Amino acid sequence: VLSDTNQAAGFLEVRPGERATDVFANAAKLSGIAQSEFDTIIKNKGKDILPNEAGGSFEGWLEPGTYNVKSMKSASEILKAMVDKRIAKLDELGVPAGSDRERVMIIASIAEAEVNKADYYGKVTRVIENRLEQGMSLGMDSTVAYGNNVKPAQVTTEMTQDESNPYNTYKISGLPPTPISNPGDSAIQAALHPEGGNWLYFCTVNLDTGETKFAATADEHDQNVAELRKWQA
């Protein structure tokens, strides 16, 4: 949440796991620069701002942190500051340059959206890698939600059946086309270095505490889902 003091001073806080559309809206509001200026840059696929591997999408490429947007003269200057910081951070974290960067951030963004505890990120990224390796669909609500511009809790069965959504990982094979948020350091490191394990499933069994259980078999996963249903009852 943006603190009142920072907002008043024109400082923008970009949070880990925040979607690019929210960052653009907050940046326009706090800087006083027209939203249309940001929209034009987005429409032009971040030309001269984004690296080639971003594929013309800002999602994932806006480094979390605090930015004095009030002091910046244009939407281009604001977005370039965020992207340049992101590139520097990826270098610092040792993320290989080139197309691997986009892959790492896609996986990191999914992990951050799926669970609310950094302790679980490495297990979620392992589940993703294991499922990809076995040719399984990812079946992640967070990606479906992103493609529908809703929160994961708002995903419906109908949405998971929609084959026209390129982010519907119940229907598409492999990874979605872009990251689904701007992941933070912990999630990126988890994507780079997944925990060792043979898990293929996970389920958050307590939505208050965020307790999440991981499973290697469908039967084991079904037991975890039953535990969630019991908690929800």
Model-assigned labels for residue ranges:
Residues 4-32, 95-101:
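Glycine-rich loop/hinge motif
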Residues 29-36, 40, 47-233:
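Bacterial extracytoplasmic/cell-wall-associated proteins, especially those involved in peptidoglycan
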Residues 1:
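Extracytoplasmic/periplasmic/luminal assembly and interaction segments
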Residues 17, 40-42:
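Short, glycine-/polar-rich solvent-exposed loops and beta-turns at beta-strand/coil boundaries
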